């Protein structure tokens, strides 16, 4: 029988790291603030002292709409949590001189770019999505695609 999960029994695979995709910055900062406070409360000898767990990253876009993912710090051996809010339509980008809101598909593409930029170096990657991408479709009708299932397969195959 497995033991009950609690914060004291949960062990990270390595040092914690957080990455916010575009549109998830505020949520990631709230999570980071709570983690820093919690680490300070359980840190007896000062070895866990950390000001932030957020890793500097970016998903810039070119004027034709193409994008790329960039991670500015090493993730080797870290327990990485990537936070992605695919339902945030408040994020815009410049597309041939016009500001265009990001769609859930573009948020998901940025998530995959960040995972690729991590280059399989973290010890573990966990994706946190407040709203599951394409999660509104609960059954197949006719010849429809099952995008949520496809997305989960893609993320699983990425490692």
Regions found by a protein language model. Give the residues of each.
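PRPP-associated nucleotide enzymes
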Residues: 1-159
């Amino acid at each position: 029988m497995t033991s009950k999960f609690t914060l004291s029994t949960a062990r990270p695979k390595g040092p914690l790291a957080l990455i916010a995709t575009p549109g998830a910055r505020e949520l990631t900062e709230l999570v980071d603030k709570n983690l820093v406070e919690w680490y300070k409360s359980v840190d007896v000898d000062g070895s866990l002292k950390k000001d932030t767990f957020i890793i500097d990253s970016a998903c810039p876009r070119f004027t034709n709409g193409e994008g790329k993912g960039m991670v500015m710090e090493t993730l080797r051996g870290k327990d990485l949590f990537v936070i992605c809010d695919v339902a945030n339509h408040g994020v815009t980008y410049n597309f041939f001189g016009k500001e265009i809101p990001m769609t859930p598909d573009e948020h998901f593409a940025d998530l995959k770019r960040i995972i690729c930029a991590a280059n399989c170096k973290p010890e573990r990657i966990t994706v946190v999505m407040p709203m599951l991408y394409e999660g509104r479709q609960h059954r197949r009708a006719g010849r429809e695609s099952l995008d949520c299932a496809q997305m989960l397969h893609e993320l699983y195959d990425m490692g």
